[in-house]
Amino acid sequence: MHGRLVTLKDIVLDLQPPDPVGLHCYEQLEDSSEDEVDKVDKQDAQPLTQHYQILTCCCGCDSNVRLVVECTDGDIRQLQDLLLGTLNIVCPICAPKP
């Protein structure tokens, strides 16, 4: 635009559609043998284990029994289900009793 006032003849519109762009990618991927090696290494790794302290009562004399176990998260949840169910822990004093 030239001048102080805007007039319609100063505005030029270019109303041609843009050139179409192909959206297909023709790029070739490189060999992924390194990725396969990483996947194998991750599969061979053992799951992460932690120490868990369990304080419960003896089913015979109601004395406190402390256990320390090392297992995975899934295994400790299974142990919790067993302890809340029918599994009972016996202290060393009550163990020899029938």
Curated annotation (Swiss-Prot):
Pfam families: E7. One of its GO terms (biological process) is symbiont-mediated suppression of host innate immune response. The keyword DNA-binding applies. It comes from the Viruses. Homodimer. Homooligomer. Interacts with host RB1; this interaction induces dissociation of RB1-E2F1 complex thereby disrupting RB1 activity. Interacts with host EP300; this interaction represses EP300 transcriptional activity. Interacts with protein E2; this interaction inhibits E7 oncogenic activity. Interacts with host TMEM173/STING; this interaction impairs the ability of TMEM173/STING to sense cytosolic DNA and promote the production of type I interferon (IFN-alpha and IFN-beta). Interacts with host ZUBR1. GO terms for cellular component: host cell cytoplasm; host cell nucleus. Keywords: Activator, DNA-binding, Early protein, G1/S host cell cycle checkpoint dysregulation by virus, Host cytoplasm, Host nucleus, Host-virus interaction, Inhibition of host innate immune response by virus, Inhibition of host interferon signaling pathway by virus, Interferon antiviral system evasion, Metal-binding, Modulation of host cell cycle by virus, Oncogene, Transcription, Transcription regulation, Viral immunoevasion, Zinc, Zinc-finger. It is found in: Host cytoplasm; Host nucleus. Belongs to the papillomaviridae E7 protein family. A motif (Nuclear export signal) lies at residues 76-84. GO terms for molecular function: DNA binding; DNA-binding transcription factor activity; protein domain specific binding; zinc ion binding. A motif (LXCXE motif) lies at residues 23-27. This is Protein E7. Highly phosphorylated. It comes from Human papillomavirus 11. Plays a role in viral genome replication by driving entry of quiescent cells into the cell cycle. Stimulation of progression from G1 to S phase allows the virus to efficiently use the cellular DNA replicating machinery to achieve viral genome replication. E7 protein has both transforming and trans-activating activities. Induces the disassembly of the E2F1 transcription factor from RB1, with subsequent transcriptional activation of E2F1-regulated S-phase genes. Interferes with host histone deacetylation mediated by HDAC1 and HDAC2, leading to transcription activation. Disulfide bonds: none annotated. A zinc finger (unnamed) spans 58-94. Coiled coil: none annotated. The E7 terminal domain is an intrinsically disordered domain, whose flexibility and conformational transitions confer target adaptability to the oncoprotein. It allows adaptation to a variety of protein targets and exposes the PEST degradation sequence that regulates its turnover in the cell. InterPro entries: Papilloma_E7 (IPR000148). Residues 1-42 are annotated as: E7 terminal domain.
